[in-house]
Amino acid sequence: MSGYGQQGVSAANIDSIRPKKRLSIGVVGSGNWGTAIAKICGENARAHGHHFRSKVRMWVFEEEIEYKGEKRKLTEVFNEAHENVKYLPGIECPPNVIAVPDVREVARRADILVFVVPHQFIERVCDQMVGLIRPGAVGISCIKGVAVSKEGVRLYSEVISEKLGIYCGVLSGANVANEVAREQFCETTIGFNPPNEVDIPREQIAAVFDRPYFSVVSVDDVAGVALGGALKNVVAMAVGFADGLEWGGNTKAAIMRRGLLEMQKFATTFFDSDPRTMVEQSCGIADLVTSCLGGRNNRCAEAFVKTGKSLETLEKELLGGQLLQGAATSKDVHEFLLTKDMVKDFPLFTAVYNISYEDMDPKDLIIVLQPLKEDSENEGGTETE
């Protein structure tokens, strides 16, 4: 499969590559997405035994659960049932995926560390791993979002790299965890462009994740891959507002188009990103469409308009208290744009922030979609069905 610029790399020819050594895979995180990823890693560790050691360790934040009428530790239940009965019930994981309650054990034993924890915990988790990483190890971040501070916008892969002193790539795409776990076909994108001293080829990284139902393409544009997964949540909020107002498909298509352009503009303005990433890869337009057609950000934004309830209330009612990432990201992005004096350059992102936090009437979103006079004064028009 081809990417942009240079050829995208897949795992299709992995068996023709002679590995320098068999690598161990560790998964940091065990929610529904973390467990789905661990399942994939476990399957590939067995399928490519000359590339990977069979055992895949998955760090599980230890907690007690009710299981068959008894109080049991979650790790014990997983290793007995080969199923994450709390976060991904009904999905069997291969027996070579082992749950461990100590993230330090995963850190010590893995050559490839796959990070799938909620973004608000990543720094704390990395702090526990400092000084324990194997020489030559690399990371892959499956965490969607960006870290924003007064210093600027950082990718979570950058946070991991800085904390642990390793190279870290990114995996992102139109990947709903439950659908992936049920082996419904989807595509994903890996951004992996390590320095020369990293001794693990991209094909081997792709082979950690590539399955017949989980099609992987690896490209160089790490920033573009990461930002697609973060910024699409803001656009999904805008489409959710439109759903709440019962606007039609034409209007929602316009929102998605404008949103995609702002995603692309943000990535190329503030990062060294290829503009084609957003339109050619699953991490861009495909993930955007999936989120806009019914993800949690879309649903909560629709309910925000229809019920008049605050986003904080809807987070409790619809998300079990989890943070609504689209709204939070819009706030982070808005504060960053203020420091750059570029708020007006991203009108859709700004509108989502203003509706979410500044009492802007959602109906005024339509104003953002109307072209400025100077943009259209020289355009002709034709009628279409």
From Swiss-Prot:
Highest taxon of source: Eukaryota
Modified residues (Phosphoserine): S376
UniProt entry tagged with the keyword Phosphoprotein: yes
Keyword annotations of the record: Cytoplasm, NAD, Oxidoreductase, Phosphoprotein
Entry's Gene Ontology cellular component terms: cytosol; nucleus
GO biological process: cellular response to osmotic stress; glycerol biosynthetic process; glycerol-3-phosphate catabolic process; glycerol-3-phosphate metabolic process
GO molecular function: glycerol-3-phosphate dehydrogenase (NAD+) activity; NAD binding; protein homodimerization activity
Top enzyme class: oxidoreductase
E.C. numbers: 1.1.1.8
Active-site residues, Swiss-Prot/TrEMBL: K232
InterPro entries, alphabetized: 6-PGluconate_DH-like_C_sf (IPR008927), 6PGD_dom2 (IPR013328), G3P_DH_NAD-dep (IPR006168), G3P_DH_NAD-dep_C (IPR006109), G3P_DH_NAD-dep_euk (IPR017751), G3P_DH_NAD-dep_N (IPR011128), NAD(P)-bd_dom_sf (IPR036291)
Catalysed transformations (reactions): sn-glycerol 3-phosphate + NAD(+) = dihydroxyacetone phosphate + NADH + H(+)
Protein location: Cytoplasm
Keyword Cytoplasm set for record: yes
Main location: cytoplasm
Residues that bind NAD(+): G29, S30, G31, N32, W33, G34, F121, K144, A177, R296, Q325
In-chain residues carrying the UniProt-annotated modification Phosphothreonine: T382
Name this polypeptide is given: Glycerol-3-phosphate dehydrogenase [NAD(+)] 1
The encoding gene: gpd1
